[in-house]
Each structure stands twice: as C-alpha cells, then as structure tokens.
Amino acid sequence: MSTTMKVMQLLPELNSGGVERGTLEIGRALVAKGHESVVVSNGGRLVPQLQQEGTRHLQLAIHKKSLSSLFKVRPLRRLILQEQPDIVHVRSRVPAWITYFALRKIPQKNRPHLISTVHGMYSVNAYSAIMTKAERVIAVSDSVVDYIHQHYPHCPKSSIVRIYRGINLKEFPYAYQPSAAWWNTLYQLFPQLENKTLITLPGRITRLKGHEYLLNLISELKQEFNVHGVVVGGADEKKQGYLDELQQRVVDMDLQEYVTFVGHRSDIREWLAASDLVLSLSTQPETFGRTTLEALALGTAVVGWNRGGVAEILNRCYPAGLVEPENAEALFKKIHQLLATPMPPAPVQDFQLSQMTDQTLALYQEVIGLR
C-alpha cells in the first residue's frame, strides 16, 4: 500500500474563522508531508491562499442550510468518485449531511473513510447529530468530548479523539512588541488610547461575548486606574442593531472617553500584544478559545470564566486568570488584583500547531491502515 494519502476536506465557505483556519492548516501540513490535499467549499477570500499553499480547491455550493442543498448530493458523489480520496473530512453540519447521502450510494469497498471534526457545541438535535456519525470524531477540546458524551451517547467513546487546536508560536512569539510605526498609526486613529492601561475584549460583536461585563468593569475601574476598554471585532449586518445598542449603552454610562470599538482588525496579534489585559467572558462555554491562547503566547495576561475550552487553556497556561463563571464581583476583584500587581504569564508550551497537525495526520493514517 502506498504511504501517501489523499484527503478531501469539506466545509461551507472559506472566508474567516476557526474552522477555515484549521482547514488551511491541515492542507498545508498534508502538502508538506507529500500527501495530496483537496478542499470542497462554496469558495471565499481564503481560496487563493489555500491554492498557493498547494491544496486544490473544488467549488460546490455546500453552504446553504436549506433542503435545496440536497441537490448537491449527486454532484458531490461524482466529485468523490472522480477524486477517489482515502479520507473525507467533514467540518460542518450542512457538508456533513450532503456527504452522508453522497457516500450511501457508493459501494462500501470503494467508499473513502469518513472523519468529522466537532468544532462547536451545537444545538442538540437530529440535525447536529450528523457530526457524530463518522468513523472517527475529532473533538477540539475536552469540553467538546463531554458535550458529545452527554448529548450523543450513541457515539462510541472509542470513536472520539480529542485533538486540541493549536497555534504557531513563531507567529505569536513571547514578549512580542508591535513596531513603532504600528503604535504611531494606532495613536493617530485612536488618540484616546495613548498612555492608557488597555483592557481588551476580542471577538465578533454578538450577545454571547460578554460586552456588558466589560462596560461595567470599566465604569468601576476608571475611578482608580487609568484604564481604557477596547472592543476588537466587527459586527455583521445581522448584529448591527446590537452594536448600536452597545454604543448607546456607552453613552448612557458616560463612558465615551473610556471605551473604544475598533471594529474588525487583521492585526489582532498587535492588539493582543499591546493590551495590558485580555478578557474572555462569553456567556456560553467556548469550545476552545484560540484568542485566549494567542494572547497568552504573546505574554499578555488573560482573565476568563472557569468553563469550556478557555478554562482548559487557562488551567494549563495561566490559572491566575480563572474566575467563577458569571460572577461579576469575583471578576472585578481578579482584574483589580492583576492591575495592582501584574502577573505576566510564562511562555506557552502546550497547544502548538505542529501537535495538532501531527495528531490529525496520524489519525488519518491510522484509519486507512498505513501504520
């Protein structure tokens, strides 16, 4: 049997986000090891990068959450028969359903092996259950493993493999400092941030991210510390109303000089490094918490709720940042303590990108019996 393998990853689109990033990372790792990498999606702005890194992209509209997506079953089956991948790796629910029906009419002996990754703690229903119906189910954290055990007991424990997502520490070097040019541009755009202690809440603008906690914190802390709250992340059209609501709340609380919304940024590394504290205050458990990890890798302290993937990262890398979930008083005390007596995190040793890619490729090879 040949030691090279062909892997086809499927996801809705290739624009931005953790699922997309992970797809590119695995594609890159496959190509680097001499394997063949194919991605099927509806396309997006990351396609040129994907192709530049050696992965072939096949465009198919497998992104719509509607019954019309079932019309893509036959075209996908044709693609699979044409490409003959060893592994089909589904990373989202709509592509998983289309793949499920596409594979059913392929004879067992000609069928590729099916792997899924559960990237999120989806709403619990039959639609989401498809993510647990693969030969191997990758969970991106122990919290996701627990979620699968609890809500999908039919999924054999032996099928579930926990593979943490990881980051490239060369991209997030410890004690990294933004360039003088970056600081100059920052102060030109946002002069109100100069000489301030920056407390940053990164992430897209949604009700789940805990912005209210940030506003209340800044309102209390500004009486004692020279703080400024920074919200890094944009709002899509559907969430624009919530952003307007938050900005009105800032006015109502008289915090215009103490909180800044900087919108979507491509220079997140610089913002995390420039921050004195980064917060992770989602109202629901995070499946992993990549931004928490990126901030810690750079040497920036992170404070977050003691639950979900963020707690797994903080427990290993910065336990001083853990706070009882939804406890506003404990949160204030913790941040007050860290502002009064800063405790920078030690260099991160775990959650490296190479560990994630090596474990995933090893799983592929195990499933197709190459080892």
Annotate the PLM regions.
Residues G17-E25, T197, L201-K222:
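A conserved mid-protein helix/loop that constitutes part of the nucleotide-sugar donor-binding site
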Residues V39, A301-G304:
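Short hydrophobic beta-strand element within catalytic cores of glycosyltransferases
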Residues V40-R45, P202, H228-D244:
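Glycosyltransferase donor-sugar binding loop
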Residues V90-A96, V118:
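Short His-centered aromatic/hydrophobic patch
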Residues Q108-D142, H154:
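A conserved, positively charged/aromatic
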Residues P173-Q192, E245-Q247, P342-P344:
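A short helix/loop element that forms part of the nucleotide-sugar donor recognition site in Leloir-type
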Residues K238-D244, Q256-R265, W271:
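Active-site donor-binding acidic/aromatic loop of nucleotide-activated sugar
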Residues R316-A328, H336-A340:
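Conserved acidic donor-binding segment of nucleotide-sugar-dependent glycosyltransferases
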